[in-house]
Amino acid sequence: MIDGDGYRPNVGIVICNSHGQVFWARRYGQHSWQFPQGGIDEGETPEQAMYRELYEEVGLTKKDVRILASSRHWLRYKLPKRLVRWDSKPVCIGQKQKWFLLSLECDESRVNMQRGSTPEFDGWRWVSYWYPVRQVVSFKRDVYRRALKEFAAIAMPFKERKERKLKRYKSKRG
């Protein structure tokens, strides 16, 4: 399913833990890392697609996570010309993504990347909140930055937000 502008509807998933870290997954057989993501099927809502992709790619179910937020708008990125399949119709020039911020509500041992028919990932780790913006493939960086910026106030632990406010207060007074 590709829209009239050549973008494939897709969901992006940011899973955070109680320490403000995010789930960072290594693409199967590659050295590249990214957040879980995947296409929205015909007749599927973005939320339904998110839960399906979450299970297929990470092995987690609806009861394992809690939705904290979703992006207000679709965030788009264009594929580099070398990755566009010009011979397929309609031509897909990029992805438009609805992003979801989830909190992990279960033990991390429930993560199982072998649940889908073809594994997307072969490893994962927790990383600092902003780390993915610097590490993801370059053509996705702006979308990652925008999604994480939108979710930052919700995802960052309360303690960290409180410490930042205290620092700002002290610097204004001192």
Curated annotation (Swiss-Prot):
GO terms for cellular component: cytoplasm. One of its GO terms (biological process) is mRNA catabolic process. Residues 6-149 form the Nudix hydrolase domain. Its cofactor is a divalent metal cation. Keywords: Hydrolase. Its EC number is 3.6.1.-. Gene3D superfamilies: Nucleoside Triphosphate Pyrophosphohydrolase. One of its GO terms (molecular function) is mRNA 5'-diphosphatase activity. A motif (Nudix box) lies at residues 38-59. Pfam families: NUDIX. It is an enzyme of class 3 (hydrolase). PROSITE patterns: NUDIX, NUDIX_BOX. It comes from the Bacteria. Transmembrane segments: none annotated. Belongs to the Nudix hydrolase family. RppH subfamily. HAMAP family: Nudix_RppH. Accelerates the degradation of transcripts by removing pyrophosphate from the 5'-end of triphosphorylated RNA, leading to a more labile monophosphorylated state that can stimulate subsequent ribonuclease cleavage. This is RNA pyrophosphohydrolase. It comes from Photobacterium profundum (strain SS9).
